[in-house]
């Protein structure tokens, strides 16, 4: 099973087109994030985020066998925990959080972790710098260690925390050092690369060596609407790196689907 665990919605896509793109790319299932990065939606407005989450619920309706919707929540806004519960009632199965103006260990974020833990929802965090020039100071991997205070949470740090990839490896390694099996680990890391191409091979080499493939998962980080060709090109980029690292087929399958399946509570075909 191939799972694309990091796809952005824009608010302009149609479910049939999304499924067609996945089919063209050879992707079985995908995590879709509620829109929050275009002019029609804002991360800093509660009504906007509620509208985005409702939109995503409608988009995936009847397609939940392949499309898993993740709500977008800003913990700094009033009633964020209540909005997360509403999103769950709408059929969304996880949440995306972007530390921007708040640190992952702040009280407002802890309330969301409590709610997500209660609802058993996985969390995808942005980690590392932002490509638009906003400060990434809130998104260093070490700041997410607070997650360990919520043992039922299962989270993924996107982009391997670039440029703090060694720090991300250190955070993820703790469970492995203590004998926790990858499928039961609290932390996973997506390889939707923030690293420029010149760094990517070494970043992935270290991550595989330190974290094992059991904690690494594929995400294209594309923005919908898009072609299957674009998604496939991101898959091909990863495949080329794995070729250079002489990675075997079972390991590739783990990175391209198995790790995300465990994170999402899915069976692996």
Label each region the model flagged:
Residues 37, 46-138, 183-186, 193:
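Active-site gating/metal-coordination segments in enzymes
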Residues 6-8, 33, 70-72, 96-98, ...:
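A cross-family glycoside hydrolase active-site/sugar-binding cleft signature
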Residues 10-13, 37-40, 75-79, 102-104, ...:
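Active-site environment of divalent metal-dependent phosphoester hydrolases
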Residues 3-5, 10, 18-42, 66-72, ...:
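Divalent metal-dependent hydrolysis catalytic cores, especially in the metallo-beta-lactamase
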Residues 1-5, 11, 16-29, 85-86, ...:
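Mid-to-C-terminal alpha-helical segments outside catalytic/metal-binding sites
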